[in-house]
Design a protein with these regions (language model features):
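Cytochrome P450
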Residues: 1-164
Length: 164
């Protein structure tokens, strides 16, 4: 649906922003192009384009000491899950070599797993590769402050001003 079409645009902007603002990340990916896929997954983990999902509990359950009744509305934070320090050491660090970057839950999990996740991942990776190939001197425009991703659905920077 619309999320599968819009997500690669947001994900590409977020991936490029992280590559351009994390010391050594862009240089590592340029030196080892095989890292682009992992860098995309790491950016999907750290800055998911959709940060929360709404669900209804199908059974009563206790999570971290909180009781949730069957039928209750639950808001799931993908952004928080993707920064779980029990799963991702140094969870707030963008690491293009993170061994388990693909273990993120940006595309949900289980029966609600995004059916377009593979397409979104391939499109994002292709867009990042194309940008890096087309603009070897790509960098943030120094006359503008580095943007920050914003929003809870289609989260991305409002603008990514670059020069090359």
């Amino acid at each position: 649906g619309v999320q599968t079409c819009a997500l690669p645009i947001c994900a590409t902007a977020n991936a490029l922003l992280l590559l351009l603002t994390t010391p050594g990340a862009l240089e590592a990916v340029r030196a080892e192009p095989d890292l682009v896929g992992n860098a995309v997954d790491e950016s999907l983990r750290l800055e998911p384009s959709v940060v929360r999902l709404d669900r209804y509990a199908t059974v009563a359950v206790e999570v971290a000491g909180a009781h949730i009744e069957a039928g209750e509305f639950v808001m799931l934070s993908l952004a928080a899950a993707n920064r779980d320090p029990a799963v991702f050491p140094d969870p707030d660090v963008f690491d293009v070599r993170r061994a388990n970057a693909r273990q993120h839950v940006t595309f949900a999990h289980g029966p609600h797993l995004c059916p377009g996740m593979h397409l979104a991942r391939v499109e994002t990776e292709a867009a990042v590769r194309a940008a890096l190939d087309a603009w070897p001197g790509l960098r943030l425009d120094p006359s503008h402050p580095a943007p920050a991703p914003a929003g809870t659905i289609f989260r991305k920077p409002d603008a990514l001003r670059v020069v090359w």
